[in-house]
């Protein structure tokens, strides 16, 4: 049995909890239930069925606030003690245009957390520990080092680390005990899948991109008309900016990565007014012909750039040539800067699925076979199929769910089935797209991701999040379509979802 966190609803002058409400019965009592931002702890301490103590509620503080295109306000709360973030799920309070609370997503912790340990290693110490755990990677880049405390009061460091351009591809998340330096958890995220000129990708589709022109030729870097910097570097040539004497002489893999990266950035800008991956104008950086240490036939997001390996099939194309794969990788970046879905278990499968669904939509939603554009003599299919996940050995319903699925040909478990179990949500998302159309579906997906989901979200939370987004933006009919799609996969009105027992199944494709 698995129990996801719930959406907490306000009904009349009271607040009740449920995980199956279709929102059609949701009644917002604006006059009775209006809270200011300074009263967020009051909301959490007065929930009718899931109320937490006032002392526990007072440890929550607002760390982010957004207003969406429909006038809904979303306050993201984080639990803190003595200025240190508690490693529990975020909570998001959703308010209508009048300031009335409509729902609360996440999983409030009814516990007053107190620090019961000391920090004996510090940031420099944790860097040494992680470096010693990666002896073959000489140039690690620490993207984030955050001190946190768990519910038991143990201090630890959560560290996001990648490699420098000259190092082997690495993308890792560590949790290191701040008292004795032991590695509590390690997640490997590596294996996922000036002026403007017109460049054509591998399929002769033209794109306008910024470049630098000089007397010696053309270089693939520059700033676009929104102020975002774009660049592609060569993984086989000391990670230098890709350049050539003329347009026709440019590395085609680099052109694919560059044009597709610009296209995906523009998609998010045009449809959701998102200013680059982090919504703050971060550079769009790509590495092509990545070596690991030899030809690396894969692609991944490392926290600051997209990395595309050099294909091991001479007659084939790299993953940079597939617009849906580029959209997939860049959406991992969007997720990292919004919901922050942890790359483990169901939250990790959601992370993968949102990337697949958005990549599919960005590429025109014409082929449900993700990565089909990279097919070659040796790579005859894509990597996943949204319409029929079973084609690649993925489950399509919760009856086939397995959190112990492994990568094909390896003894390593798939981070709790992040790639394997994404097939369930992929099929649900594909059904929603077919029944509501691209425009409505993409808005529901994006809004649920950036406004409702929290880092430890489960499949049932994605259902509630999409229901909320559909209801707010398109009404009861759209919400019914979303509900039916989830019901068809066994993610329905029940608070607990029955799943099969884990087995030694194998993930067919990476």
From Swiss-Prot:
Belongs to the peptidase M4 family. Pfam families: FTP, Peptidase_M4, Peptidase_M4_C. Residues 1-30 form the signal peptide. Its main location: secreted. One of its GO terms (biological process) is proteolysis. The active site is at 329, 419 (proton donor). Residues 31-192 form a propeptide. Transmembrane segments: none annotated. It comes from the Bacteria. It comes from Enterococcus faecalis (strain ATCC 700802 / V583). Ca(2+) binds at residues 324, 376. One of its GO terms (cellular component) is extracellular region. Metalloprotease capable of the hydrolysis of insoluble hydrophobic substrates. Hydrolyzes azocoll and gelatin and, at a lower rate, soluble and insoluble collagens. Does not cleave short synthetic peptides. Preferentially hydrolyzes the 24-Phe-|-Phe-25 bond in the insulin B-chain, followed by the 5-His-|-Leu-6 bond. Inactivates endothelin-1, primarily by cleavage of the 5-Ser-|-Leu-6 and 16-His-|-Leu-17 bonds. Hydrolyzes the alpha chain of C3 to generate a C3b-like protein. Inhibits complement-mediated hemolysis and opsinization of bacteria. CDD domains: M4_TLP (cd09597). Zn(2+) binds at residues 328, 332, 352. Its EC number is 3.4.24.30. It catalyses: Preferential cleavage: Xaa-|-Leu, Xaa-|-Phe, Xaa-|-Tyr, Xaa-|-Ala. Keywords: Calcium, Hydrolase, Metal-binding, Metalloprotease, Protease, Secreted, Signal, Zinc, Zymogen. InterPro entries: FTP_domain, Peptidase_M4, Peptidase_M4/M1_CTD_sf, Peptidase_M4_C_domain, Peptidase_M4_domain, Zinc_Metalloprotease_M4. It is found in: Secreted. Inhibited by L-leucine hydroxamate and phosphoramidon. Not inhibited by phenylmethanesulfonyl fluoride. Reversibly inactivated by straight-chain aliphatic alcohols. It is an enzyme of class 3 (hydrolase). GO terms for molecular function: metal ion binding; metalloendopeptidase activity. Optimum pH is 7.2. Active from pH 6.0-8.0, activity decreases rapidly at more acidic pH values. Stable only above pH 5.6. This is Gelatinase.
